[in-house]
Swiss-Prot record:
It comes from Human respiratory syncytial virus A (strain A2). Belongs to the paramyxoviruses fusion glycoprotein family. Glycans are attached at N27, N70, N116, N120, N126, N500. Residues 76-96, 158-209, 481-516 form a coiled coil. Changing I379V: In strain: Cold-passage attenuated. This is Fusion glycoprotein F0. GO terms for cellular component: host cell Golgi membrane; host cell plasma membrane; plasma membrane; viral envelope; virion membrane. The chain crosses the membrane at residues 525-550. Pfam families: Fusion_gly. Changing C212S: No effect on F1 and F2 structure and glycosylation. InterPro entries: Fusion_F0_Paramyxovir. The record marks R109, E110, R136, F137 as: Cleavage. Changing R108N: Complete loss of cleavage between F2 and p27. Residues 26-524 are extracellular.
Length: 574
C-alpha cells in the first residue's frame, strides 16, 4: 500500500540522515577576533548548486464518462465519493493548466478533447478563478526569479503537438524512458502512477456491475490510497499556482527520488551526497505543472546539480565594535559588513552574503551559486589583518552604540554598550558571566543562553573547538572628531580617505587662521610703531620747545653804558 510505502521511505531517509550525521563527524573550529569583533566558523564542506537537472513525471488518468452504480452499500458510497473527488481534481488541474504561462493557444484549443468533466460552477466563475490564478502565478514567478527557467522551458515544449503522445508511447511497456523532445533536448520521463489501468480494468467493472456490491473493504482502501496522491498533487499545484518547492513526497516518493538521482549524469560522489541528503535536495528542488492531455498528467521536476563539492567552507559572524566613552553620545562604531558563507571554488571564493539561503546538514553546506558573488582568495586576509594592502575590507560606520548579540556556530559574540546589562547563563547554575562594555565572545561550553537587555538568545549546541584571538579594538585607532558616520557600504580605504580629507581640511583651516592672525599682528605692530614714533616725535618737539623756553627764561638782560647814560636814549632824543 502506497501510504505504508511513503512512511517506510520517510523512516529510511531519517535513519540514513542520522547515520550520515554520525559518520561524517564534527571538525568545526571557531576563531574570535577581538580587534574586529568578528568570528569565523571553519571545518565545513561545500555542496554548491551550479546547474539544474529536469525530468518529466507522468500520471496516467482515466476518462470516466459515467458511473452506472446507484447502490446503497456503504463501500459503494465510499467508492463513488472517491470518484467524485477524482473528477474534481482533474477539472481543477485543467483549469490550472489554462492559467499557467507555459500554456499556448493550441493546447488550450485541444483541452476539451481530453475529458468531458466540467465544474458545476458557471462559466463566468471559472473565468474569474482563472484570472486570479494567473495573477498569483505571475507573482510567484517574480519571487523565484530565473530559478525555474530550465523547468519552464521543458514544460513549454510539452505543449507542442505530439510531445505528450511521444512520452506516452515511450512509457507503454516501462515506467521509465529517455525521450527526445522536439527542441533537441533529451529528458528522463517516469510514470509514477497508473490510475487509468486501475480504474478502467479493476475498479469500474466492479462498481458498474448490476449488483453494485463490493465484497471487501480492501478495494475501497486501495483506491483511496491511489487517489490520495493525485488529490494531494492537485492541492499543492492549486495552492502554489502551478509551481511548488520543496518537492513533496507526493510529487516524488523517496524511492522515486533516489531512483531519479541514481539515473542522473553525475559522479558517484555527487550521487552519494544527494542520496544522503534527500531532504535538502527536496528543499532546493521545484515541481512545475505542465500539461494534462491525452489522459496524461505531466509535470516537470527540477533537481539541483551540485557541481562543486567537498571544498572548504567557512562562515563569518560580525557584530558592532564601538568605543566605550562614559559620555553619552560621544562613541563611534564600526562593523564588518562581509558576514555570510564562503566556499572555495576553482581558485577563487564564492561568497553568499545572505547566509540564510544556504542549508547546513551536519558539516555540509548546501548553497546556490545563483546567490553568490565571486571574490579573490585574499578576502581571507580581512580576518587576520583588516588593514592589509591586498584586499580592501568592507565595513560600515555609525555613532550609535546599540547593544546586541550574534549567535555563532560554537558560541556568541556580545556587543554591550552604555547602561545595558549583558550576561551569559547556564540553565542549572544561572548567570555565569557578566559582560563589561565593549565587544566580547563566549563559547557554548557550559553556557545555554545570552541575555542583552531584555532580549534572550539561545546558543547552538554544536561541538567543536573555540579560539579567542586577542587584539586592540581597531575602533580605538580612530579620532571621534574626524570619524565619518553613517557609511553603510564602505571599505577601510574609503573610511581612511575621508578621515584624511577631514584632517587636511582642518590643517588648511588652521593655516588660514594662522595667516589671518599673523597679518593682523603685523598690522598692529606697524600701527603701534607709527604711533610710538609720532608720540616720540611729538614728545621730542615738546621737549625741545620746553628746553628753549626754559633757557630763554633763565638768561639775564644786560644794558650798555650809553643806554644807561641816557644820551642816546630814544626817550630823550627829541
Amino acid at each position: 500500500m502506497e501510504l505504508l510505502i511513503l512512511k517506510a521511505n520517510a523512516i529510511t531517509t531519517i535513519l540514513t540522515a542520522v547515520t550520515f550525521c554520525f559518520a561524517s563527524g564534527q571538525n568545526i573550529t571557531e576563531e574570535f577576533y577581538q580587534s574586529t569583533c568578528s568570528a569565523v566558523s571553519k571545518g565545513y564542506l561545500s555542496a554548491l548548486r551550479t546547474g539544474w537537472y529536469t525530468s518529466v513525471i507522468t500520471i496516467e488518468l482515466s476518462n470516466i464518462k459515467e458511473n452506472k452504480c446507484n447502490g446503497t452499500d456503504a463501500k459503494v458510497k465510499l467508492i463513488k465519493q472517491e470518484l467524485d473527488k477524482y473528477k474534481n481534481a482533474v477539472t481543477e488541474l485543467q483549469l490550472l493548466m489554462q492559467s499557467t504561462p507555459p500554456t499556448n493557444n493550441r493546447a488550450r484549443r485541444e483541452l476539451p478533447r481530453f475529458m468531458n468533466y466540467t465544474l458545476n460552477n458557471a462559466k463566468k466563475t471559472n473565468v474569474t478563478l482563472s484570472k486570479k490564478r494567473k495573477r498569483r502565478f505571475l507573482g510567484f514567478l517574480l519571487g523565484v526569479g530565473s530559478a525555474i527557467a530550465s523547468g519552464v522551458a521543458v514544460s513549454k515544449v510539452l505543449h507542442l503537438e505530439g510531445e505528450v503522445n511521444k512520452i506516452k508511447s515511450a512509457l507503454l511497456s516501462t515506467n521509465k524512458a529517455v525521450v527526445s523532445l522536439s527542441n533537441g533536448v533529451s529528458v528522463l520521463t517516469s510514470k509514477v502512477l497508473d490510475l487509468k489501468n486501475y480504474i478502467d480494468k479493476q475498479l469500474l467493472p466492479i462498481v458498474n456491475k448490476q449488483s453494485c456490491s463490493i465484497s471487501n473493504i480492501e478495494t475501497v482502501i486501495e483506491f483511496q490510497q491511489k487517489n490520495n496522491r493525485l488529490l494531494e498533487i492537485t492541492r499543492e499545484f492549486s495552492v502554489n499556482a502551478g509551481v511548488t518547492t520543496p518537492v513533496s513526497t507526493y510529487m516524488l516518493t523517496n524511492s522515486e527520488l533516489l531512483s531519479l538521482i541514481n539515473d542522473m549524469p553525475i559522479t558517484n560522489d555527487q550521487k552519494k551526497l544527494m542520496s544522503n541528503n534527500v531532504q535538502i535536495v527536496r528543499q532546493q528542488s521545484y515541481s512545475i505543472m505542465s500539461i494534462i492531455k491525452e489522459e496524461v498528467l505531466a509535470y516537470v521536476v527540477q533537481l539541483p546539480l551540485y557541481g562543486v563539492i567537498d571544498t572548504p567552507c567557512w562562515k563569518l559572524h560580525t557584530s558592532p565594535l564601538c568605543t566605550t566613552n562614559t559620555k553619552e553620545g560621544s562613541n563611534i562604531c564600526l562593523t564588518r559588513t562581509d558576514r555570510g558563507w564562503y566556499c572555495d571554488n576553482a581558485g577563487s571564493v564564492s561568497f553568499f552574503p545572505q547566509a540564510e539561503t544556504c542549508k547546513v546538514q551536519s558539516n555540509r553546506v548546501f548553497c546556490d551559486t545563483m546567490n553568490s558573488l565571486t571574490l579573490p582568495s585574499e578576502i581571507n586576509l580581512c580576518n587576520v589583518d583588516i588593514f592589509n594592502p591586498k584586499y580592501d575590507c568592507k565595513i560600515m560606520t555609525s555613532k550609535t552604540d546599540v547593544s546586541s548579540s550574534v549567535i555563532t556556530s560554537l558560541g556568541a559574540i556580545v556587543s554591550c554598550y552604555g547602561k545595558t546589562k549583558c550576561t551569559a547563563s547556564n540553565k542549572n547554575r544561572g548567570i555565569i558571566k557578566t559582560f563589561s562594555n565593549g565587544c566580547d565572545y563566549v563559547s557554548n561550553k557550559g553556557m545555554d543562553t545570552v541575555s542583552v537587555g531584555n532580549t534572550l538568545y539561545y546558543v547552538n549546541k554544536q561541538e567543536g573547538k573555540s579560539l579567542y584571538v586577542k587584539g586592540e579594538p581597531i575602533i580605538n585607532f580612530y579620532d571621534p572628531l574626524v570619524f565619518p558616520s553613517d557609511e553603510f557600504d564602505a571599505s577601510i580605504s574609503q573610511v581612511n580617505e575621508k578621515i584624511n580629507q577631514s584632517l587636511a581640511f582642518i590643517r588648511k583651516s588652521d593655516e588660514l587662521l594662522h595667516n589671518v592672525n599673523a597679518g593682523k599682528s603685523t598690522t598692529n605692530i606697524m600701527i603701534t610703531t607709527i604711533i610710538i614714533v609720532i608720540i616720540v616725535i611729538l614728545l621730542s618737539l615738546i621737549a625741545v620747545g620746553l628746553l628753549l623756553y626754559c633757557k630763554a627764561r633763565s638768561t639775564p638782560v644786560t644794558l650798555s653804558k650809553d643806554q644807561l647814560s641816557g644820551i642816546n636814549n630814544i626817550a630823550f632824543s627829541n
